[in-house]
Amino acid sequence: MDPHDDHPDAILRLPDPGATDALARRLAPALRAGDTILLEGEIGAGKTHFARALIRARLAALGLDEDVPSPTFTIVQTYEAGEAEIWHADLYRLSGPEEIWELGLEDAFRTAICLVEWPDRLGSLRPSDALTLRFAAEQDDSRRLGLHASGPRAQALLRDLLAGAGA
């Protein structure tokens, strides 16, 4: 559990899936190898939707139209996306850091753009410089998104993202 859950750096309201897609499209071009986005929230909160929208946006910018499946059963999906490979990991079914180490995710944190669902499973492997997006479903089907940046690169991404969101 992220110690900043109760005190995010910023909170956004995403009224519908289109707003989630738009946010993902804004963030996608800013990401580079070594960037990590940690996606938190309950099942159905919007983590996978956001990750898939971001990956699609990154691939579309390269003229690619690939299927972007959920990594729920494969645990990790990778995509060649120009200058940086993208790793989309869903750690829900893993029990802890030792299984994550076997996947090679620790190395990917340095060499790829990493989108990680259920980052609480990372334990001590959690990157110190990461942008955390905490999704929460609201009663009206909108999403409340808490954002927290830990580290200088994540802080720069958050500033740019909020500037583009008009926050």
For the regions a language model picked out, list residue spans one by one:
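Hydrophobic anchor at the beta1->P-loop junction of P-loop NTPases
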Residues: 37-39
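Short phosphate-coordinating micro-motif centered on Lys-Gly-acidic
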Residues: 2-3, 10, 96-101, 105-167
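N-terminal pre-Walker A segment at the start of P-loop NTPase domains
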Residues: 2-24
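P-loop (Walker A) phosphate-binding loop of NTP-binding proteins
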Residues: 42
